From Swiss-Prot:
It comes from Pseudomonas fluorescens (strain SBW25). GO terms for cellular component: cytosol; small ribosomal subunit. Residues 93-118 are annotated as: Disordered. This is Small ribosomal subunit protein uS13. GO terms for biological process: translation.
Amino acid sequence: MARIAGVNIPDNKHTVISLTYIYGVGRTTAQKICADTGVNPAAKIKDLSDEQIELLRGEVAKFTTEGDLRREINMKIKRLMDLGCYRGLRHRRGLPVRGQRTKTNARTRKGPRKPIRK
């Protein structure tokens, strides 16, 4: 298994699919990485040479991925909460942030129903 950005990449999958195992790299970004490095997207990781894997590592390093990306997202949410803006309050209360209705639905975000006390 090749190791890129601290993640073990599966050997038996195509390069584009394998790169998506890295947090922060989706299909489009993976295709862009393959195009920039000149690596065949349909080639399997086990068939790539060490030089090609090094090229992939260098290209992935240009993007914010894994722990840095998670930290960045959490810091942005924390900033909204500290500002006390509407979006921050919604995050703090665990409610939908982007204007969805909450009278019905929104169960995933709100969690399980709380029993009505009498």
